[in-house]
Amino acid sequence: NYLEAYSLEKIEKSEYYTNPQCEHYGICGGCSLQDLNYNEQLNQKNVQVKDLFYRIGKFSSIPINNIIGCEQHYGYRNKMEFSYSSNKWILDLNEKDQEIDNTAFGLHVKSRFDKIVDVNDCHINGKLSNKIFQFLKQNLYKYNIIPFDIKKRTGFLRNVIIRQGHATNQILINFIITESDNSCLIPIAKSLVSEFDEIKSVLSSTVKRNSGSSFSDEEKILWGEDYITEKIDENIYKISSNSFFQTNSKQAKVLYDLIIEIAGFKGDEIVYDLYCGTGSIGLHIAKHVKMVYGIEIVMSAVIDAI
């Protein structure tokens, strides 16, 4: 009694259709609902949650409330991971017979692991982070940084992670590379710091060439600290490159306040915050309960929480 289907042709626009802001929408895998008006986006997310609980989880008696929308629909993300690749997605088929630059700095093509859309701008990314992204886009080639070829498993720079504290305006940049020697990144790191006063941390993290993840235990500081801070309510959180933190800082406060409201804490409770990351949920509710225990496997996140 369950089927999945894929769109073959668009005959008529839905009543919920809206023009997506992003010129890459539909090809880029970074977003999936930009062509729906926001209320319908929330409705479709509600449908997905119900499907997870009712059809997959078999929790048929659990009531599912409506999704709480965010005031800021664009520019809300505090973390983006961009790929630097020699496998550019060619939009114009006429280019195939021309000598073209296959280097791309952007996001994966939808449903493709091996092709990167060379994006010009990312509308869900914060404004400051976008400026840094565009600076990198203009300068990576200038500084002779070799892009990664995901098919051949060759090249130096795989990804660039940009994290931004929306309340503090602090920036962390992490270059995900395939070799331990990061000396070729020093000039571009200096250039970044000179251009953007908000940058507090520039790092490099080495991952194996055949790894499908950007997570690394070998992290080196190119400039500054190894973390930034973010403020939610009166709490200031320390965030390192590998630590999990809610990617929408403003909506995180809405979520955390809702947890307190629904839980109805009396002040004598002991709370276990499982998979706590930097401990942002536990620390937010700490003053409302007797004790909070955070449980987390990523050591850098544990250090951040402490």
Regions found by a protein language model. Give the residues of each.
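Flexible glycine-rich surface loops and low-complexity tracts that mediate binding to linear polymers
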Residues: 1
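N-terminal cysteine/histidine-rich coordination modules
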Residues: 4-6
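Extended interfacial segments that mediate partner engagement and assembly in macromolecular machines
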Residues: 9-16, 26-146
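Residue-level signal for inorganic ion chemistry
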Residues: 31, 160, 202
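Internal alpha/beta scaffold segment
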Residues: 114-156, 179-204
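Short edge beta-strands and adjacent turn/loop segments
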Residues: 154-167
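Short, aliphatic-rich beta-strand segments
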Residues: 162, 169-178, 236-240
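Rossmann-like S-adenosyl-L-methionine
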Residues: 180-306
